[in-house]
């Protein structure tokens, strides 16, 4: 169809969720990261929850390996498992050392309901879907962190130098991280070039749900250390 040729899959997904994605930048937690005003208790609790999120996120890639129809896609998913465990989690490990978070504390910290709902949904999509559906769920998270970090730097150029939160900001705008997102995007475009309108609508549904879960995750993070939230 003519409209299909005019807009790639990723552009379509981003257009469908532009209001949700715009809301990320206004989240109090993200604003706190940007200006360095975030309560460290909230950030500490966020690091613990995000650690557990990443463990399940990695499992989504592992299901992708099992669902792969080509060696190329299999290698892509496998590469990301390593990239997440060696890359993103290393950012967390640094903060864990700073905050004195032990494996024992991690093991005894309950996973918050919003976090569990998000990863359960992603795992469900992965088990039910194929390569493109899995990539769609993954890309929502992976790319949103880059977009958020870039916007932070655009609005507060000194943010990457902040003694506490600068490392977080820098981690999501590194050439490795942003380069990996380009690879994900290109593969998603290739896998969906012959998708029907019905298939594309389903991807839109997945991407929208994951984007809403991302927004909820930032809201959850802002509740940490407050009454009714997780005490750091």
Where do the protein language model's features map onto the residues?
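Extreme N-terminal tail/first-helix region
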Residues: 7-14
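Short, Lys/Arg-enriched N-terminal segments with co-localized hydrophobic residues
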Residues: 1-6
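Active-site-proximal alpha-helical scaffolds that flank and shape metal-associated catalytic sites
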Residues: 12, 72-179, 208, 212
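Acidic, carboxylate-rich catalytic segments that either coordinate divalent cations
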Residues: 204-232
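Short alpha-helical hairpin
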Residues: 14-38, 57, 185-194
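Long amphipathic all-alpha helical oligomerization modules
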Residues: 174-208
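A non-catalytic, amphipathic alpha-helix used as a structural packing/dimerization or gating element
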Residues: 45, 49-56, 79, 83, ...
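Alpha-helical bundle segments that constitute or directly flank the non-heme di-iron/ferroxidase center
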Residues: 18-23, 38-67, 87, 136-146, ...
């Amino acid at each position: 169809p003519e409209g299909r040729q005019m807009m790639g899959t990723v552009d379509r997904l981003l257009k469908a969720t532009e209001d949700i994605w715009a809301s990320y930048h206004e989240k109090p937690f993200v604003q706190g990261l940007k200006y360095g005003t975030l309560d460290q208790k909230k950030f500490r609790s966020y690091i613990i929850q995000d650690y557990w999120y990443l463990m399940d996120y990695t499992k989504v890639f592992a299901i992708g390996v099992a669902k792969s129809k080509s060696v190329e896609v299999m290698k892509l998913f496998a590469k990301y498992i390593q990239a997440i465990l060696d890359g993103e989690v290393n950012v967390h490990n640094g903060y864990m050392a700073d905050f004195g978070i032990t494996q024992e504390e991690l093991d005894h910290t309950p996973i918050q309901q919003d976090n569990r709902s998000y990863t359960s949904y992603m795992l469900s999509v992965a088990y039910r879907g194929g390569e493109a559906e899995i990539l769609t769920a993954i890309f929502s998270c992976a790319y949103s962190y880059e977009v958020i970090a870039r916007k932070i730097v655009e609005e507060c150029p000194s943010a990457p130098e902040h003694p506490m939160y600068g490392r977080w900001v820098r981690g999501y705008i590194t050439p490795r991280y942003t380069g990996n997102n380009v690879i994900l995007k290109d593969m998603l475009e290739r896998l969906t070039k012959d998708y029907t309108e019905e298939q594309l609508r389903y991807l839109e549904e997945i991407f929208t749900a994951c984007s809403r879960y991302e927004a909820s995750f930032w809201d959850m993070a802002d509740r940490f250390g407050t009454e009714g939230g997780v005490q750091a």
